[in-house]
Amino acid sequence: MAKNKALFECQACGNQQSKWLGKCPDCGAWDSFVELKAEQIKVLKELAQVSMKTSEAVCIEDVELEHFTRYSTDDNELDLVLGGGLVEGSLVLIGGSPGVGKSTLLLKIASNLAKQGKKVLYVSGEESKAQIKLRADRLEANTPNLFLLTELCLENILEELHKKDYSILIVDSIQTLYSNKITSAAGSITQVREITFELMRVSKAYNISTFIIGHITKEGAIAGPRVLEHMVDVVLYFEGDATKEIRLLRGFKNRFGGTNEVGIFEMTAKGLISAKDLANRFFTRGKAISGSALGVVMEGSRALVLEVQALVCESSYPKRSATGYEKNRLDMLLALLERKLEIPLGHYDVFVNISGGVKVSETAADLAVVAAIISSFKNRPLSKDSIFIGELSLNGEIREVFSLDTRLKEAKMQKFKNAIVPSKPLEDIGLKCFVAKELSQVLEWM
């Protein structure tokens, strides 16, 4: 009798190898390979055969376009991120840290869609019906078309889907489900991958729009195989500090629209609502203090004025820390200050914080970060009427940023008077713009 071929799978990313490896060549995880049992390998082969369909090549000019049906979720922020509304039969994956409000958001959306007359099935593997009902009472989300199911078995969920003509399915969360066809534990790579595949098949076959909540790892990525994000139609990340009110919903993948928009929500006593009057949520206009500078960043099509806070203090064992800002970018800016402005930061602790719990990734905030650091180092307060916009290069030049006019218009609306920018705006905004091409010019202005 021929010996069965062994198959090992990485529990971190789903990579498969014919022999055990100490380190995964795909994701780099150590000691993550486990051997799959014969039953698991058999199921994987059967599922792979089901998904294989023969088709003929067709000339691209003969392909007929599909017209997707969209409908509003009655939430302007979510509709914005989804590209104009929810597409019928789409599969949406939402990830986020514990306590950020994923379940609260989807329960609100479930209620909105149910009030439109659509039948919604909310499946929870983490909470009881009574717990969900308590939250629904608080959110005023009770409606006859919203059905609750506390179930962990995929086959039982699919059976319930076939009983009623559901239009919306919400799964909270994908890591808690298991399939009877697979012998591995719930939340394993194989379970997550194959359950998602089955949900995708059902969504497309019956035009059921499906939301899936996914846990995230300590690195901030959605737990489970990387192929999970490739299988779904839309990938959204829910960000925010659980101790603060503002939440950001970012799109990282969207087969039916763009990914350049960000939804902004506010956590209130009645749940998540579309945030209003965002202008003063991320900065204060109080007394000028050292270590504080204001900048303007773009979040999708929005311009937001943010306060950058910096603390520089002498230390025998200097360290650098950044909250809401990239640590590697901060290290580069500190090296630039030492090299170009001869500011001796080698014996100083440097802490940088972006107020409001917002994570800044664009380089247009470089100038504001540097201004806050210099202000703290020299103990020299900066005017609250001034904003700093610009990207810094490695040679100390201040480079232009995109959407400069949009940023300056937002600053004007917030009644700022001065702007330190790399170039003049295309139109007269009504601000005093001080053009700085090099970092040394900013120091002279300060």
UniProtKB/Swiss-Prot annotation:
Signal peptide: none
Protein EC: 3.6.4.-
Class of this enzyme: hydrolase
SMART domains, A to Z: AAA
Span of the annotated motif RadA KNRFG motif: 253-257
Biological processes annotated in GO: recombinational repair
Residues binding ATP, per UniProt: G96, S97, P98, G99, V100, G101, K102, S103
Region (Lon-protease-like): 349-446
Family matches, as PROSITE patterns: RECA_2
Zinc finger (C4-type): 10-27
Record remark on domains: Has a putative N-terminal zinc-finger, a middle region with homology to RecA with ATPase motifs including the RadA KNRFG motif, while the C-terminus is homologous to Lon protease.
Family: Belongs to the RecA family. RadA subfamily.
Primary role: DNA-dependent ATPase involved in processing of recombination intermediates, plays a role in repairing DNA breaks. Stimulates the branch migration of RecA-mediated strand transfer reactions, allowing the 3' invading strand to extend heteroduplex DNA faster. Binds ssDNA in the presence of ADP but not other nucleotides, has ATPase activity that is stimulated by ssDNA and various branched DNA structures, but inhibited by SSB. Does not have RecA's homology-searching function.
UniProt name for this protein: DNA repair protein RadA
Organism name: Campylobacter jejuni subsp. jejuni serotype O:2 (strain ATCC 700819 / NCTC 11168)
Lineage of origin: Bacteria, Pseudomonadati, Campylobacterota, Epsilonproteobacteria, Campylobacterales
Gene assigned in the entry: radA
